[in-house]
């Protein structure tokens, strides 16, 4: 039903595939339900103001991103857009819990910790995503710190905390 809603809301395929960097720097493709207009990544200037474009270049995030569709807002708020990533788990590219998979450009945001973070299999959710994914940015350094915290403290107990926090965030729509 989500696929039908996406196709009714805006033209284009309901699934989105993007290259990210997996464990040990291996390129992988992650799957998601499309939450933006179809040409959002190819032509962001069609949809964003100059201020929004500057924020995107700085933080890889935009407040009230105009490229996100109505259905996309709901899918993101409930994290339902991430469900297709279980295909990536079955393929062995992702784990359920780990640092979020990032683009090649974003890997450099980790600085000297880049190889350490990439030594861990990325996950559908993780410490950063579960604690404050909507409240921190690369520019603040908080995202890097939270992802590195997970890599350095991996345990069944921490995974359980991430799972519970993720579930609570999904219920609250954060």
PLM region spans:
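A hydrophobic, helix-centered structural microdomain
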Residues: 1-42, 88, 156-174
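Hydrophobic structural segments characteristic of membrane proteins
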Residues: 5, 83-174
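Short, glycine-rich, amphipathic interfacial segments at transmembrane boundaries or analogous
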Residues: 16-66, 125-146
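Alpha-solenoid HEAT/Armadillo repeat architecture
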Residues: 61, 76, 149-150
């Amino acid at each position: 039903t989500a696929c039908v809603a996406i196709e009714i809301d805006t033209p284009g395929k309901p699934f989105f595939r993007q290259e990210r960097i997996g464990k040990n720097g291996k390129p992988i493709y992650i799957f998601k339900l499309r939450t933006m207009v179809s040409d959002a990544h190819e032509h962001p200037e069609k949809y964003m103001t100059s201020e929004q474009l500057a924020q995107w270049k700085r933080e890889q995030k935009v407040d009230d991103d105009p490229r996100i569709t109505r259905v996309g807002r709901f899918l993101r708020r409930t994290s339902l857009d991430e469900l297709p990533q279980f295909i990536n788990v079955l393929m062995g590219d992702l784990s359920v819990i780990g640092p979020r998979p990032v683009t090649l450009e974003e890997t450099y945001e980790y600085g000297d910790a880049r190889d350490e973070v990439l030594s861990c299999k990325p996950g559908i959710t993780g410490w950063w995503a579960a604690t404050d994914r909507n409240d921190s940015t690369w520019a603040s350094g908080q995202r890097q710190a939270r992802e590195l915290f997970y890599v350095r403290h991996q345990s069944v107990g921490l995974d359980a905390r991430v799972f519970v926090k993720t579930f609570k965030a999904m219920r609250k729509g954060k």
